Amino acid sequence: MKVHFIGAGPGDPDLITVRGKKFIMQSPICLYAGSLVPESLISDAPADAEVFDTASMTLDEIIEIMADAYDRDLSVARVHSGDPSLYGAIGEQMRQLRKRGIPFDVTPGVPAYAAAAAALETELTLPGVSQTLILTRTAMQSSEMPSDETLANFGRTRATLAIHLSIRNIQKIRTELEPFYGAECPAAIVYQASWPNQKVLRCTLATLPKKVRAAKITRTALILIGPVLGARDFKDSALYNPQHVHILRPKKS
């Protein structure tokens, strides 16, 4: 018996990993976050599997289901959206399982920011433009931010920002980042990346709030900000430059 924490990816069933799908097919018990994971992603669970939508459950209720499965020697597929290591709240679940001596493993998934970049047909790190991607969020009622993890501190880097779970703070994001990136800095909102109803909005930092309001987006959207989103005249990477010699491409005699 084992609890399998599975990253289901951003939403499209084709984007779950082979390993993640295998564990869902093999597990007699399946728990999934129904608010973020489409039911189609768990359709491969055994026909007689016990399936639970955890959207309305507490941590204790989730752990009790896992503990009961352990007592019955039944493996559990615990399906999270995106990659479970990022805003997946698996840390507290793993801590409880360790206390109880219940074995588990983690299967990574395609993260939302990767699906958003694919939808935008863009690279998030470009030579001479930005080589850093910051994954962050803003404070909400459910989660405070550590004191040093502020938009201003991140903005000073002028790195590419992927801001999660923060669409309701869109005006705050514009106000706090504009002094560092400038009003005309390219930005984008990707709503429900990879889902059938995906929306991709390109704009500038100054027009972010207006775009969000016009599209009536209130949740499940990723905000991307940074010069890479509009860069066209960037230099080529040295990776494929014939003058760049390395162990796999030695200097020609």
Report each predicted region and the residues it spans.
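Residues at the C-termini of beta-strands that transition into short coil/loop
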Residues: 34, 55, 108, 128, ...
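Class I S-adenosyl-L-methionine
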Residues: 1-110, 115, 209, 221
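A contiguous loop/helix-start segment that scaffolds small-molecule binding in enzyme catalytic cores
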Residues: 2-3, 61, 71-76, 132, ...
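Class I SAM-dependent methyltransferase SAM-binding "motif I" and its flanking Rossmann-like core
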Residues: 1, 12, 83-157, 201-202
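Short secondary-structure boundary/capping segments
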Residues: 21, 43, 68, 124-126, ...
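Short beta-strand/turn micro-motifs composed of small residues
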Residues: 32-34, 80, 137, 165, ...
